[in-house]
């Protein structure tokens, strides 16, 4: 089922359109106090239920940062949405989506360990139940396990109570079965959200993490060419990048070590979202 969902919703990922402090990828919260509003919050006066099918698009600025990601950060960052990190931060935030296991995750973990970098793995309940040893490795080796919901629904299409159950159900299962581990960031299935779901997720203590880079890597039967994929990924490098890669991809697995080398050789740190 997860494979079908990925195939049906793939292109939307690319094209659709407290006190003062910083959030998980280094943005200023813009608040002077708990009750304060940022300009973005003031502009969005109601919890809109309009579904946003997010994608970073192809347009970039003079610093190679995707315009779509920057616009989304400006518009939705006040609600806990994370699309791109700070422009002055020479960091790559490396994330993987895990809906089912395709034999690649163990090798990905080996590479990350060899390169001494961490990543965030967004998992579903089915994945956690079917691959507990891999989830344990993620946690034990210092990576972040993120919440990708129990059943991978489009969050704007379900009720407030169901959104809560989708996120809290996975959170509770992971906590109960992995030594009290607490998930603190969430990636919305299919990259779909609304102001309503952003607020709900934020009220649960989560940031909603999207991305500033994603590409067509999820179809295991039609994998991208290795050389082209390497060029696509490295040429998109930018400060504060949030990379979404699918861990089912043999291509991603084959080039990951070289991609990390490229980033590090060019002065970038590679981290999980919360590191």
Q: Which ranges hold each PLM region?
A:
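Divalent metal-coordination and catalytic microenvironments
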Residues: 97, 112, 145, 186-189, ...
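A cross-domain feature marking catalytic cores of carbohydrate-active enzymes
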Residues: 96, 123-126, 147-149, 188-190, ...
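A short, flexible N-terminal coil/short beta segment enriched in small residues
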Residues: 42-45, 183, 190
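Active-site beta->alpha N-cap acidic-glycine motif
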Residues: 54-156, 162-175, 182-183, 269
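Terminal accessory/targeting
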Residues: 1-92, 110-119, 239-275
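Alpha-helical scaffold elements lining the catalytic groove of polysaccharide deacetylases
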Residues: 104, 153-178, 192-239, 252-258
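A broad, structure-centric signal for solvent-exposed, well-ordered loop/edge residues
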Residues: 8, 130, 135, 145, ...
């Amino acid at each position: 089922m997860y494979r079908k969902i990925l195939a049906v919703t793939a292109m939307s990922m690319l094209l659709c359109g407290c006190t003062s402090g910083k959030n998980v990828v280094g943005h200023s919260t813009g608040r002077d106090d708990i009750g304060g509003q940022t300009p973005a919050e003031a502009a969005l006066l109601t919890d809109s239920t309009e579904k946003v099918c997010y994608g970073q698009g192809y347009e970039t600025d003079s610093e190679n940062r995707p315009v779509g990601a920057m616009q989304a950060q400006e518009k939705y960052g006040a609600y806990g949405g994370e699309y791109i990190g700070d422009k002055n931060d020479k960091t790559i935030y490396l994330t993987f989506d895990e809906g089912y296991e395709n034999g690649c995750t163990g090798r990905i973990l080996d590479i990350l360990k060899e390169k001494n970098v961490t990543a965030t793995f967004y998992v579903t309940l089915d994945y956690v139940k079917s691959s507990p040893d891999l989830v344990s490795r993620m946690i034990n080796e210092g990576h972040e396990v993120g919440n990708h919901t129990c059943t991978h629904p489009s969050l704007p299409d379900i009720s407030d109570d169901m959104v809560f159950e989708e996120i809290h159900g996975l959170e509770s299962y992971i906590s109960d079965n992995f030594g009290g581990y607490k998930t603190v960031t969430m990636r919305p299935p299919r990259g779909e959200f609304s102001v309503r779901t952003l607020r709900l997720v934020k009220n649960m203590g989560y940031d909603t993490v999207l991305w500033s880079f994603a590409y067509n890597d999820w179809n295991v039967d039609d994998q991208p060419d290795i050389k082209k994929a390497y060029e696509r990924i490295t040429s998109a490098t930018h400060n504060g990048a949030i990379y979404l890669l699918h861990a089912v991809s043999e291509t991603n697995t084959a080039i990951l070590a070289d991609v990390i080398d490229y980033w590090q050789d060019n002065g970038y740190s590679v981290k999980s979202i919360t590191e």
